[in-house]
């Protein structure tokens, strides 16, 4: 008989049933999809582009490889990977949320980025791909929204080729006390107001702030990746630990 903890999950600071969380997270991203890119620029003052560029640099992706951009949303990383793998490679943009996938597809097609990209609606906990399929997997600002993170990490490990690498770019825990104080004030008081003003949705951005606080810290996530089977797991603190990039290999 499953324990109460096994049947529940965090939705921000609230504890909800696991299946309820998936529905609630879906509603958040259906709501924010149309304004997602604009809000990313406003919320991070454009710094998210630097974080993503660093992720690309750490990916080791080469021509003719196959890449999974998981929880790929509006396709920022997919666009870069598409050019890196070339005509002989493939990038799969996967997202559980149909609205985000639609925005990403339209954005990339409007930029003329078409030929080597596929779009798949997929749950990170049960990826619909064969074993040992991808040379590289990235999940950017998506893992904290997954209900069962350990299950998702195991699923990523399964579909990654031996010699491949996983990159997890995610909000984390500031390593400077003064920065943490300022960051909390910004996240809980200013961010929801920006969400209300720009996207008419303070609630979704309040969830964003809460979900960041509930996400595992740097060392905990490193341990989770190791437990899922990844080797040589390390991480890089970015912007004082506001964001961390975790990298693990499958040998």
From Swiss-Prot:
Enzyme kind, highest EC tier: transferase
Reaction catalyzed: a 2-demethylmenaquinol + S-adenosyl-L-methionine = a menaquinol + S-adenosyl-L-homocysteine + H(+); a 2-methoxy-6-(all-trans-polyprenyl)benzene-1,4-diol + S-adenosyl-L-methionine = a 5-methoxy-2-methyl-3-(all-trans-polyprenyl)benzene-1,4-diol + S-adenosyl-L-homocysteine + H(+)
Keywords from the UniProt entry: Menaquinone biosynthesis, Methyltransferase, S-adenosyl-L-methionine, Transferase, Ubiquinone biosynthesis
InterPro entries (alphabetical): SAM-dependent_MTases_sf, UbiE/COQ5_MeTrFase, UbiE/COQ5_MeTrFase_CS
GO terms for MF: 2-methoxy-6-polyprenyl-1,4-benzoquinol methyltransferase activity; demethylmenaquinone methyltransferase activity
Pfam families referenced in this protein's UniProt entry, alphabetically: Ubie_methyltran
Single GO biological process annotation from the record: aerobic respiration
Entry EC no(s): 2.1.1.163, 2.1.1.201
Entry-linked CDD domains: AdoMet_MTases (cd02440)
Binding site residues for S-adenosyl-L-methionine: 74, 95, 123-124, 140
Gene3D superfamilies: Vaccinia Virus protein VP39
Metabolic or biological pathway: Quinol/quinone metabolism; menaquinone biosynthesis; menaquinol from 1,4-dihydroxy-2-naphthoate: step 2/2; Cofactor biosynthesis; ubiquinone biosynthesis
Protein family per UniProt: Belongs to the class I-like SAM-binding methyltransferase superfamily. MenG/UbiE family.
Role this protein plays: Methyltransferase required for the conversion of demethylmenaquinol (DMKH2) to menaquinol (MKH2) and the conversion of 2-polyprenyl-6-methoxy-1,4-benzoquinol (DDMQH2) to 2-polyprenyl-3-methyl-6-methoxy-1,4-benzoquinol (DMQH2).
Protein name as it appears in the record: Ubiquinone/menaquinone biosynthesis C-methyltransferase UbiE
Organism, scientific name: Pectobacterium carotovorum subsp. carotovorum (strain PC1)
Organism placement in taxonomy: Bacteria, Pseudomonadati, Pseudomonadota, Gammaproteobacteria, Enterobacterales
Gene of this entry: ubiE
């Amino acid at each position: 008989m499953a324990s109460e903890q096994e049947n529940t999950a965090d939705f921000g600071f609230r504890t909800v049933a696991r299946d309820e969380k998936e529905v609630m997270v879906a509603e958040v991203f259906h709501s924010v999809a149309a304004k997602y890119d604009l809000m990313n620029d406003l919320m991070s003052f454009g710094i998210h582009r630097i974080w993503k560029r660093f992720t690309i640099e750490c990916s080791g992706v080469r021509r003719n490889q196959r890449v999974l951009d998981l929880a790929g949303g509006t396709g920022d990383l997919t666009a870069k990977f598409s050019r890196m793998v070339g005509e002989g490679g493939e990038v799969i943009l996967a997202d559980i949320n149909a609205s985000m996938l639609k925005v990403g597809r339209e954005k990339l097609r409007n930029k003329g980025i078409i030929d080597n990209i596929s779009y798949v609606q997929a749950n990170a906990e049960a990826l619909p791909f064969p074993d040992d399929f991808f040379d590289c997997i990235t999940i950017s600002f998506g893992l904290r929204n997954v209900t069962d993170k350990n299950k998702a990490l195991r699923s990523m490990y399964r579909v990654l080729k031996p010699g491949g690498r996983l990159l997890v770019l995610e909000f984390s825990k500031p390593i400077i006390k003064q920065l943490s104080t300022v960051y909390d004030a910004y996240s809980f008081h200013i961010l929801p107001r920006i969400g209300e003003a720009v996207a008419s949705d303070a609630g979704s951005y309040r969830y964003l702030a809460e979900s960041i606080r509930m996400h595992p810290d740097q060392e905990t996530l490193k341990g989770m990746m190791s437990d899922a089977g990844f080797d040589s797991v390390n991480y890089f603190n970015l912007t004082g630990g506001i964001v961390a990039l975790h990298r693990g290999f499958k040998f």
